[in-house]
Amino acid sequence: MANTVSAKKMTRKIAKRTAINRSRRSRMRTFIRKVEEAIASGDAATALTALRSAEPEIMRASQKGIVHKNTASRKVSRLTARVNALQA
């Protein structure tokens, strides 16, 4: 348990930041899931629109420190490859 005033304040800040990060990570995963569901259904047009909305969300998560930049790029790259394969 935090004893000093500054430690109590840091505990509050950490709790707030954790909630924000959890929300951002969940939002990113939701966008990824929408793309994957569209790919699974075989609908290329829906998959493409879902990918176009998911890409900025994934990159925003990387800029906010939710995921590493390379991880975000890898996710976008793999989703793009799957959508392109669906269109071909």
UniProtKB/Swiss-Prot annotation:
GO terms classed as biological process: translation
GO MF term set: small ribosomal subunit rRNA binding; structural constituent of ribosome
Keyword check for RNA-binding: yes
Entries under Pfam families matching the protein: Ribosomal_S20p
Keywords, in A-Z order: Ribonucleoprotein, Ribosomal protein, RNA-binding, rRNA-binding
GO CC annotation, single: cytosol
Family to which the UniProt record says this protein belongs: Belongs to the bacterial ribosomal protein bS20 family.
NCBIfam families for the chain: S20
Known function: Binds directly to 16S ribosomal RNA.
HAMAP family assigned to the protein according to its UniProt record, in alphabetical order: Ribosomal_bS20
Identification of the protein by name: Small ribosomal subunit protein bS20
Annotated organism of origin: Methylobacterium sp. (strain 4-46)
Gene name of this polypeptide: rpsT
